[in-house]
Amino acid sequence: MVNPVLVFDQVSLRYNGAPLLENINFTISPGEHICLLGKSGVGKTSLLNCITNTKTISKGTIYFNGIASNNKDYKQLKKQFSFLDQVPNLIDTDFVYDAIWREAKNNLKWWQRLFLVEPQSLREQIIQILEEVNLKEYVTYIIKDLSGGQKQRVEVAKLFFANSQVLLVDEPTTGLDLINAHKIMELIIQFARQKAMTLIFVTHDVEFALKYSDRIIALKNKALVLDQATNKLTKQKLMQIYHD
């Protein structure tokens, strides 16, 4: 039996006395593609922040690879999580190539950073990745001159150099037209498969949930109301969580 990568055991989160999450329980296995589904404000982003320990839970325990969230070693596990936000976190004055190079350099081991200036092999790898995300012709463009969809592609390209085990994605298609939204999600799925990563992505879009996940965990009124394999679900059933 495969050991779970992530376990939520009776997890609750409060802020200034107000509940953000209530008694959340689930288990995620390595390599699963999980969708967190629900309306805005139900606690989806808060749940991601609990995983990374950005928010401290009020009750219960989170386990990552068997290490409990109240264990001091849990805070040292942040490098095991890559995070893709709905707003690209890029420097406007960077060239596209430099944004990728900086991420690649940051993920090199210390001895590689010490002795590596900018090896041809890494340069070629960056160009190859930019080609995979359809940005090769934008390599010398400045970030501020890119569209929203192109900026998200740069963020996805940066992920190829991450050494993490879990990819957390928070509404990555916000503000994008439908065609570009699907392209971004397809790139994210492609990346997660290539790196054999566990993927947890947040969306309020039922069709995206059905298309891109193995399993859907739905939140409503701060509580978990559904946890089921995607191939057992229908659009009609999922739409019920949006009705009071």
Curated annotation (Swiss-Prot):
Part of a high-affinity transport system. Residues 6-241 form the ABC transporter domain. The lineage of its organism: Bacteria, Bacillati, Mycoplasmatota, Mycoplasmoidales, Mycoplasmoidaceae. One of its GO terms (molecular function) is ATP binding. Belongs to the ABC transporter superfamily. It comes from Mycoplasma pneumoniae (strain ATCC 29342 / M129 / Subtype 1). This is Probable ABC transporter ATP-binding protein p29. Keywords: ATP-binding, Nucleotide-binding, Transport. The keyword Nucleotide-binding applies. The keyword Cell division does not apply. ATP binds at residues 38-45. InterPro entries: AAA+_ATPase, ABC_transporter-like_ATP-bd, ABC_transporter-like_CS, Metal_Ion_Import_ABC, P-loop_NTPase.
